[in-house]
């Protein structure tokens, strides 16, 4: 996997969004278009959303911001007549929201496959710990690999906990007041500036600092800090991968370890969101998408996520996050221009 593959992935993403935007103009000229809440997702639309989800979920550029743009361009979401404290909001569409969350399963499966050795290590550690408890033996009976796997599992669960609690308490508030163009634009710009600043001050200017290169060598306080920072990503447009990667750099991980922990942390975080949303809105999801569209979205999301993760790791080995920060700021400008015409 070479660095030009990341450029190819971004070109595919741009093409998918441009196709969606062009469809929005043709749909706008058609008078018989159904309301977004009644629109059934076509297979080709599912493929576009799968590309957008798969590429943007792990790149630090905000999957939510891209999905809001693509969903609206495809006529699947609409603006509300009411305004929130940060401007116009999107009409709540449980089926569409659930579809965007459920196709995250493709991205989850991508990380499960790419980091299967880490996953096996954690499962081995968990099974070893359970065996020790059942047999009432000492924890010292665990092997080195089992102890490392158990520790990594503990690090991930600790980092996942803040988002789980905050999400349960404030999920409705976030959906009610923050799912709109301006909150996403603010988050894209703030995240872009933050990414550029953190890389400059915590990475480029601190090259000689001894950093952790193996996630198994992390301390629990570092995992907790990353988890607390992950809460910020619940603001639409922030990017979960962006905020967790820069949090990793701040606490002393090197670039690759920060990315790896971010990818692994996606397993419980995205997994919980996918299961909850799929269970809660399954009937609406089945009515609006259908099994074929859902399967296509999942498959495309998985394939593009595999490509994106491999390309990102290769890119970060030789480059950094600053180009993504610049991209976020440019994307914010595109979103402002696009949504201004629909005001």
From Swiss-Prot:
The record lists the catalysed reaction(s) as: di-trans,octa-cis-undecaprenyl diphosphate + H2O = di-trans,octa-cis-undecaprenyl phosphate + phosphate + H(+)
What is a single molecular function from GO for this protein? undecaprenyl-diphosphatase activity
Q: Give the residue spans that cross the bilayer.
A: 9-29, 95-115, 150-170, 178-198, 245-265, 289-309, 320-340
Report the EC code(s) recorded for this entry.
Answer: 3.6.1.27
Q: What class of enzyme is it?
A: hydrolase
Would you identify the family this protein belongs to, as annotated?
Belongs to the UppP family.
How is this protein named in the record? Undecaprenyl-diphosphatase
- Species: Syntrophus aciditrophicus (strain SB)
- Quick one: which gene encodes this? uppP
